[in-house]
Amino acid sequence: FLFVAIATLSVKAQDIYMGGTVGLWRNDDANTTSFKLAPEIGYNLSEQWALGVELQFNHEYKEHISTNTFAIAPYARFSYYENKIVRLFIDGGFGFATTKVKDGGDAINGFEIGLKPGIAIKLNQHFSLVAKCGFLGYKDDYMNNSGFGFSASSEDLTFGFHYEF
């Protein structure tokens, strides 16, 4: 217990970041609506390495069928280039997701393991705009996707923010 207390007190607030992404999409022609909320928290171990976790909630309504997905995705972030404004990084991690169709059968559980490249643009001392695009790795029933490969489509593009304390 004493070790945990000392370790907790030694964490500097300035090394913690929080943020996330939010998305909303509506297609009237296809009668489809989707919503995504993905908060994120992390800890900078050094100037190049960070550990973090992203939680996700996705809701999709398509052709009178509602689907909810919950996911947790811990990662290790390696920042391989940084100047005063731009930081390029790659997240290596794994995620677990469970998807449930409302009024449907059993939940579908899946996982992913892989790499996601990203960029952070520093807006001021505390706020950064963050974008991630692409995935290289393996998915098994993770958010309705399975298989091994690489993707870099607009469906993989996310924008968010980070606040560094």
Segments from the language model and where they lie:
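Gram-negative (and chloroplast) outer-membrane scaffold detector with strong preference
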Residues: 15-16, 22-24, 35, 40-116, ...
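Outer-membrane beta-barrel porins/channels
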Residues: 132, 141-143, 148
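Sec-dependent N-terminal signal peptides
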Residues: 1-7
